[in-house]
Amino acid sequence: MYLLAMRIIQDCRKRNTLKKIKDYYFHKAKSDGYVARSVYKLEEIDKKHSLLNRGDHVLDLGCSPGAWLQYTAEKVGEKGQVLGVDLQGVKLSLPKNFKVLQADIFDMKVQDLEINGSMIDVILSDMAPKTTGIRDADARRSFALNQKVLELSVSLLRSQGALLVKAFQGEPIEQLRREFSNSFAQVKLCKPKSSRSESVEIFLLGLNKK
């Protein structure tokens, strides 16, 4: 009985801690002027791996509601160019060197995703499949989605370019990692602090496209 009570107390403490973390990043995003807390995931990965630079050409897939676009604007500056694509619209005032298309990325031609007819430096994908609640099934759906993004990156990224995708933890992640290794000199698995610890989401980063 004592052990059961202790487990319940520990579970409650854990839930309260996770709620505080979630609330912290939610309120921080509002305070910092970002439309979503997901911006801090990209910021952490960028700071650790020097992903985004001034003047970069960036493709942001699954860009709505626009937090990653906001952060990217700060990083690439006026000389950079950014194209965002999402099934949903983005209700943000963005710099003139930014363009957002409301479309299905996989219905578009490769040339439609080029920026001013040139190759891309960085592809960001915060896309996720429709989930079922069944962990293995969701991991497989995420794997299939990211395979398509990886195929696109082969055609769109310049040599030494980078690809960041959101994935779900599970057996297929290692296969996806191996497939990334065929196209990138370095492959990293990233679990940002702002990503809830109980979440199965993880980010896969390919650096220095071969």
Predicted regions and their residues:
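Class I S-adenosyl-L-methionine
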Residues: 171-210
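Conserved class I S-adenosyl-L-methionine
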Residues: 55-62
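Short glycine-dipeptide loop
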Residues: 78-79, 157-161
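Conserved SAM-binding loop of SAM-dependent methyltransferases across substrates and taxa
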Residues: 65-76
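Conserved SAM-binding motif I beta-strand of class I
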Residues: 81-86
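Class I SAM-dependent methyltransferase Rossmann-like catalytic core
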Residues: 9-53
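S-adenosyl-L-methionine
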Residues: 90-117
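Mobile active-site "lid"/loop adjacent to the S-adenosyl-L-methionine
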Residues: 118-158, 171
